Amino acid sequence: MQGVKVLSLSTVFPNPAEENLGPFVRHRLQHVAKVHDVEVVAPIAVIDYAERRFRRPGIPVSRQDGPLHIHHPRWVYLPWGGYTSAFCLAARLMPFLHGLRREYSFDVIDSHFAYPEGIAAALLGSAFRCPFTITLRGNEVMHVQSPGKGRWIRWALRRAARIITVSESLRRFAISNGVEETHVRTIPNGVDPDVFYPRPRTETRFRLGIPEDRPVIVSAGFLIERKGHHRVVRALSEIRRSGSSAELWIIGGPGREGQFEEHLHREVRRHALESFVHFTGNVKSAVLADYMSAADVVCLASSREGWPNVVHEAQACGAPVVATDVGGVQDMIPAAEYGFVVPAGDEDALAAALRKAIETRWNRAGITAWGRARSWQQVGVETAEVLSQAAAETKGRLKP
C-alpha cells in the first residue's frame, strides 16, 4: 500500500484539558500513522456550549503526540447556529490550511463525524481540490433530522470519496441518505489489548476499596443525560428492593452536552442510595479497566450511540454487559453468552436484565476472547486502505 499524506479533522480529538475526549479518534489515527503520514487538525472552540469550564486558553497551538503532529487552531462555535457552525469551522480553517499546505501537501482530508467536520471537509475539499472522507460515528442520526443540518449532511455525504461507518446500522443510514454502496465501508472500533484485559478480581476489589461480598454494577461514560446513568440508578433501586446487596460505581466526569451531575446526585438521594452509589470522576483507561475487571456486570443505558467502545472494553476485561439497543450494540453483544440487550428506554427490562446478569454464572474467559478479538491495529490497517482509495479518487475533487 502506497503511503499518502492524510489531514485528519476532528473537534473531539483528546487535548491536554480534555484527555478523555474522543480516545477512539486518537487510537485509530495512531495506527493509521504506521502506514501513512498523518497530521491532525483538532480545532478548539473559543465558546463551547457557552460553559466557562470548556474555554481552554492553555491548550498549545500545536504539539506532538507520538507519531501524530497535532494543530489546535481556535474557532468560534455558536451553539444556536445550527448548520452554520460547519460553515464557521470551514471559514476559520481555510486560511489556516492554506498556510499548512505550504509545508504539508495533504492528499486526502479525513473527517470524523458528518457534523460539523464532514460538512466543513466537503467545503475545504472543494476549495483545495482534494478528496475527503467522512466517518459516521452515530450522532448523525440525530443531526440529519434537523432540516438545515440534514440537507447539508446529505450534501456532504454524497460528495465524499469514501464513507467509513463504525456499525452496520450506520452503513444502512449512509446508503439511505444517498451514498453509493460501493463507497461505504464499515470499520468498527477496536480495543487496546495492552490496557483492557482481566485483572485478578479479589486483589483488584481490595485495591479499589470495593467489598468482596457485594454484587457490583459499573456504568461508565460522561455524566450527561444521553449516557443514562440515572436509569441505572433507578434500576439499582429496583434490584435492591428485591433483596440484593448490589452497589453501583459510576465512572466519568462532566461532558460537553450540558451539566447533568447534580441531577444524578438528586436521583441517588431520591432513592436513598447514597451509601450504595459511588462516583469516581474521570479516571485513566487502566483504572477503568480495573473497575471493569472488578464488576459483576457493566451497564450501558445510553439513549443514543454509534459504536460504544465501553462495551468491548468491558468484555475484554471479562465482564458481561447489559446494554440498551442503540447503535452497534446488537453486533457487539450478538449472543446471551456475552451479555443482554434491552430496548432503549425500557427501565423495567433494564432492571430485570441487570438482576439476571448478577445471578448468572458467566464464562468470563469466553467473554474476554470475544471482547479482545478486534484490535486498534486492525482498525488502522483497514482505515489506511480506505484513505489510499480515497486519495486515488477524483470524486472528492469538487469544482470550487
Question: How should these model regions be labeled?
Answer:
Residues 1-66, 71, 396:
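N-terminal subdomain of nucleotide-sugar transferases
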Residues 7, 211-227, 233-236, 249:
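Conserved donor-binding/catalytic core segment of Leloir-type glycosyltransferases
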Residues 191, 220, 247-265:
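Glycosyltransferase donor-sugar binding loop
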Residues 261-283:
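Nucleotide-activated donor-binding/catalytic signature segment of Leloir-type glycosyltransferases, i.e.
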Residues 303:
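Aromatic "clamp/platform" in nucleotide-sugar-dependent glycosyltransferases that forms part
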Residues 311, 320-323:
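Short hydrophobic beta-strand element within catalytic cores of glycosyltransferases
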